[in-house]
């Protein structure tokens, strides 16, 4: 009789424990399905050591990378590259390799999934963000914003933007905001 009582008590305790833990598991699952900002350590497993652009291979700088891992498993990320083997005209514009698995918008411009060259160019009107296709042809240019208050700038990083679902791609203190296309 005592064995049956202990067994029932154990089963009751186990059931209560599982019921108490269920809301925590549901909350954790919901948190796991949010977009995540990626830092260099997060990208180490998926970032290639070198990338193809305009007929050549360029070494990536994993320490200067960042991106977003979307809740549905897709990625958008960028990394600085060693562009020393390219012509001066390409070096001026091609500073980072940008990969997106989903359609996004940058400064009002639509960008389809793919791999691109990107960079910040400075001219009389200020800093501009340029996007090039894999053949180094200009796709679009948009104004970059200078953020003098940005603490601890690095050569390249991604942060959350002003609104949910918006992200900032920083080159030093200059940034452009991007979001997943709707």
Please give the residue ranges for each predicted region.
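N-terminal secretory signal peptides that target proteins for export/translocation
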Residues: 1-6
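Short hydrophobic/aromatic segments of transmembrane alpha-helices and their interfaces
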Residues: 9-10, 95
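Bacterial N-terminal signal peptides
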Residues: 10-22
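Generic detector of short alpha-helix boundary/capping microenvironments
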Residues: 15-16, 61, 96
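Generic detector of short, well-ordered, non-transmembrane alpha-helical segments enriched
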Residues: 23-24, 104
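Primarily secretory-pathway and cell-envelope proteins
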Residues: 26-89, 138-182
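Mid-length scaffold segments of soluble, non-membrane domains
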Residues: 83-137
């Amino acid at each position: 009789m005592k064995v049956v009582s202990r067994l029932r008590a154990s089963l009751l305790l186990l059931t209560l424990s599982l019921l108490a833990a269920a809301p925590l598991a549901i909350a954790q699952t919901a948190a796991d399905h949010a977009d995540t900002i990626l830092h260099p350590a997060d990208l180490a497993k998926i970032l290639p050591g070198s990338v193809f652009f305009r007929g050549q291979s360029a070494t990536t700088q994993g320490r200067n990378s960042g991106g977003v891992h979307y809740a549905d498993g897709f990625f958008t990320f960028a990394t600085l590259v060693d562009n020393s083997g390219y012509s001066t005209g390409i070096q001026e514009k091609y500073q980072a390799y940008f990969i997106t698995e989903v359609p996004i918008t940058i400064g009002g411009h639509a960008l389809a999934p793919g791999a691109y060259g990107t960079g910040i160019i400075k001219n009389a009107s200020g800093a501009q963000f340029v996007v090039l296709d894999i053949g180094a042809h200009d796709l679009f240019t948009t104004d970059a914003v200078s953020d003098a208050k940005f603490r601890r700038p690095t050569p390249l990083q991604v942060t959350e933007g002003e609104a949910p679902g918006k992200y900032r791609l920083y080159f030093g203190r200059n940034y452009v905001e991007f979001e997943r296309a709707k």
